[in-house]
Each structure stands twice: as structure tokens, then as C-alpha cells.
Amino acid sequence: MQIGIYSSQSTDTAAKTIKKILDDNGIKSFSATKLKGKQVDCVIVLGGDKGVRNYFHRTFDATLPILGISEGEASGFLAQIDLKEFRTYVDVLKKQKYTVEEVPRLGVKIDGRNVYPVLNDVAVFSSKSAILMEHTLRVNGEEVWHDNGDGII
């Protein structure tokens, strides 16, 4: 088994902790920034929900399962395991006894052009203030809302 670890500078200490736990359990791991050409079973993303959103913003790869890990007291929606609990989940990872939950991404078009896919929300505003814009919200291709305003979240 091989696992990528995605972290930011603020989570480097946590990344070292995760790497040590994985090494101690015979699981190969390396920085997710060095994934190119390597086969991995999943990617561990540090930094809570923000870290998960940053990962998907920077990598557009939605094919690999990710495990979001938070370092705070509260678990999030996208990162549901706390760093303090990670050691208890290693065996589950090793035996691949987990289920992958598909989280739908939002597709956004501005002036008919696709922009980056997003996870849970998007804000669209004019580059000039107080400009009226026309918005159409479609869910699975079906129009559910149409309005004018100075922006939309």
C-alpha cells in the first residue's frame, strides 16, 4: 500500500507525525506534491475542511480516495478524523476496509465558459461594484432558479 500525504506549511508537523505512524505500520508514504507517475491507494489530506478544499482546488484529480484529517477539536464535513485518532484508523487503511463516499462537485460557468469545479460553495460577483448580473441555477441540467442581482453565493 502507498499513500500520498497532502499538507500545507502550517500542517508540516502533523504530516511528519502521519508519516511516522504509516512507516511504523509498514505503509509507504510520500508527499502528495510528488505523486506524479506514482501509484497510490489514497491521499491523506491535512488541515481539516479547508485543507480538503485546497487539495481539490490545486489538483483537479477526483479519482483518488482522500482521507481528510483535522487537527482541531471539531471534526468537519469533509475531514472527519482528528489527528489524535489517526493511529486507530491505520489498520482500516492497511486492510482497505473503508468505504469511499462520493461528494458531488459543483460545475460553474461564467459567460458560458467552465471555471474550476468546486466542492461545497461558490461566490460570483462582478469585478465592478454595484453592477447587476443575471444568474441561472441549474441542478443536473434542470433550471431551478433565475434572478438578477449584484452577486450570488
Predicted region positions:
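A short, gly/pro- and small-residue-rich
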Residues: 55-71
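ATP/NTP phosphate-donor binding region
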Residues: 1-46, 51-58, 81-100, 110-116
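Residue-level preference for short coil/turn positions at secondary-structure junctions
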Residues: 1, 38-39, 62, 71, ...
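Catalytic core of DAGKc-family lipid kinases
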Residues: 72-151
